[in-house]
UniProtKB/Swiss-Prot annotation:
Interacts (via LID domain) with ceh-14 (via LIM zinc-binding domains 1 and 2). It comes from the Eukaryota. The keyword Signal does not apply. Coiled coil: none annotated. It is found in: Nucleus. Pfam families: Homeodomain, LIM. Residues 265-324 bind DNA. Keywords: DNA-binding, Homeobox, LIM domain, Metal-binding, Nucleus, Repeat, Transcription, Transcription regulation, Zinc. This is LIM/homeobox protein lim-7. Residues 54-116, 117-179 form the LIM zinc-binding domain. One of its GO terms (cellular component) is nucleus. SMART domains: HOX (SM00389), LIM (SM00132).
Amino acid sequence: MNICMRNGYEQFSLTSPGTSDLEIGGSFWKDEPDTKYLCLDSPVEQRQHQPPMAVCAGCRLEISDRYFLRVNPNLEFHAQCLKCVQCSRPLDENQTAFVKNGQTYCRDDYRRLFTTRCSRCHGDFDKTDLVMRAGPQNVFHLNCFACVACEKRLQTGEEFQIKNNSLYCRSDCRGLDNPDTSASVPDYSKLNNNNNNDNNNSSSNFDEDEWDEERSTLTSLDNNTSSPLGSPKSDGVRTPLFGHHNSGSGGSTSSCGKKKKDKQATRVRTVLNENQLKILRDCYSINSRPDATLKERLVEMTGLSARVIRVWFQNKRCKDKKRQIQITENRLNSEREEVLNRVRVNGIGPLMVQPATPHIDNTLGGPIDIQHFAQWNGTPPPPPPQYGNPMMFNSPSTFDVSVILAPVAPNVTSPSEALGPLGASVFPHFSPQHAPFTATSHDISSPAPCGE
């Protein structure tokens, strides 16, 4: 019987064990009716026939065991890897598991870590319990939904407030020591009537040179009427004369600094009577920035100089601007403080008691059954193939005759014709002239007695 091996392309004639020679065929593919072909699958083909191995979600290794445990459609574990991440309690198909963020928990740890508890007694809720809700996060038992001060049970429709996670009824919340916010709220009536209070005085002191200190923020509208201090244009204004300041140009920096110190030491004030103040305020209410024509009329009506009128309007605009900024800041601060006080006392405003509802926590998942699966049926899969040299046999007795294929037809002259459609893929470029035939008669011998 002739046997053809893949990857070697040799053909041998096997004789009985009693003979001492192994005849090598004269031609490579002889038409002999007893010729058999041995076809072994390649390692790549063996790998393709194997089913994909499952990966354990606990140890991240392939599951080579015959049986494995499955939790959820995409979580598979070794039997020894499925356990609670908190208490390391083993889980099997006789129990239920809970999954949160890809981690498995037992029932006790899952309820302890993730279930909603009463905001007052910190107890658990049963599925049949009715609960009272105070906002999105505070949940109470029916008996726990009461004022902590008077222990009054709150009914549907009553108002309540929450402070420091404690529940208060409306009457007890009013008695709490709330921060006083009245000081931060400005008195708009006083701010708006500051100008009217000056009418009660028979005279008013006006600082003529006050605007010089704020010259960087506002600009003068009447540059033609501006004149240095001590000029003869300031009619009706008591202005002391300083000889060393008025004589010369006074251009040096040291002289300017000395002049400013002297001016701060002796400030000139103009006294305005009630009639003059009334005329200026009435004009300011109509037009806060009078032009040159209007200023000339004011000079005639009040008897004041143009410079005094210009400085009075500039000071008035600056004071009103500062007052408006202060009012806006006080209003924003009072609103912010009021919101913070409301949050510290009752969260977001006074709350209304709603009817009791069943306790349903949609954020928690239900229990998941653990299923026991077999990774393959019957015998286990073969071990991974070993890549290396072609298979060689030490003796003819090591062949498994059960894997030998069909006999060769008489007119077959090549392995591809002998194996049919499979032969073209197994021996795609086979040629008898280029066969790696190197065996000789003394390379392989028949079994012999131990004496040899």
